[in-house]
Amino acid sequence: MNVMMQKVHGSENDFFLLDETQFERSLTAEEIEQLRIQLCSRETGLLAGADGLLLVGEGTHGTSNARMRVINSDGSEASMCGNGLRTVARYLAEKNQEKSFTVETMFADLKVRQAPNLAEEVATYQVEISPVSFEAVTIPMHLGVQTLIDEIVPALSNTIRFTAVAVPNPHLVAFVDHETLNGPEFERIATYVNNENPYFPEGINVSFVEILGKNQLFVRTYERGVGFTSACGTAMCASSLLYTLLKDGVFYEEITVKNTGGMVKTVVHETSDGSYWMELIGNATITHLIEGSLTDLLNGAFEKITITETNEQKHYQEFLQTLSQK
């Protein structure tokens, strides 16, 4: 089978995007696993590897244009990925010539649409992040409490206050100063809760958040199944939600969230029933177009693959330059 694929990123959270509908049959679990191994390795993978695979398939219940699956670089499957969803939204928008539609994910059908570019030649998409839950069973966590909201967890730290929230990916978030953001405690805590431990049996994404000013955040994330990453879309949304609930954020106001890989905008919404959802607005960049046989990709025969580099990363780098000057 011939394969058309894209290398994409949202805030430099990078993926290989593969549309399974181009094939007469869906890929097998074994083929997906082999592609993940061959493509995503940072040491031996294609184009320096990636944080994961984005698989686009037919929707299963007819209300969405397509379904997105997220396979992390370690082989685990994520329930959602905000940065990845933006790139899938762009792919589907250009494929189907639509600007606004919904995409099926593991737990929800999410609204997506094209948005005004963040900068010249930086394609930008806006996606819904929901549902939100603070219940321990949805994380899951075993701390002897039903919710963990702005509390010290002695097993993790005697000084840092944590909140656990699912959006729907599970996140453990702490607001910290600049020194703590970049200090050794972060890696110690993040690696502990993402290895065998009695509190978070499935691991959890961990984010440290520095408040830069009114409606301005910097979020650094250790992503479950990936490790430290340039950015995590759901982490930035979880952080924005908690900034609104616990700090001086305001519903419906745009928040600027900076990260190692760039910048996004978020807006936190409260519905009439008291639930929450977030908008995530950011780049959807295509860096490479890839074509070759499935057999060659499965075997890692990358010398037989045709790779075409776009000029989009150049424009994204120019955008980053403007951020560093602010």
Swiss-Prot record:
Cellular localization per UniProt: Cytoplasm
Pathway as given in its UniProt record: Amino-acid biosynthesis; L-lysine biosynthesis via DAP pathway; DL-2,6-diaminopimelate from LL-2,6-diaminopimelate: step 1/1
Molecular functions (GO terms): diaminopimelate epimerase activity
Catalysed reaction, written as an equation: (2S,6S)-2,6-diaminopimelate = meso-2,6-diaminopimelate
Main location as per UniProt: cytoplasm
Source species, domain of life: Bacteria
Matches recorded under Pfam families: DAP_epimerase
EC numbers, comma separated: 5.1.1.7
Transmembrane segments: none
Active site positions: 81, 232
Site (described: Could be important to modulate the pK values of the two catalytic cysteine residues): 171, 223
Residues binding substrate, per UniProt: 13, 72, 82-83, 169, 205, 223-224, 233-234
GO biological process: lysine biosynthetic process via diaminopimelate
NCBIfam families attached to this UniProt entry: DapF (TIGR00652)
Oligomeric and partner information: Homodimer.
Record family assignment: Belongs to the diaminopimelate epimerase family.
Record's function text: Catalyzes the stereoinversion of LL-2,6-diaminopimelate (L,L-DAP) to meso-diaminopimelate (meso-DAP), a precursor of L-lysine and an essential component of the bacterial peptidoglycan.
Name of protein: Diaminopimelate epimerase
Natural source organism: Enterococcus faecalis (strain ATCC 700802 / V583)
Organism taxonomic ancestry: Bacteria, Bacillati, Bacillota, Bacilli, Lactobacillales
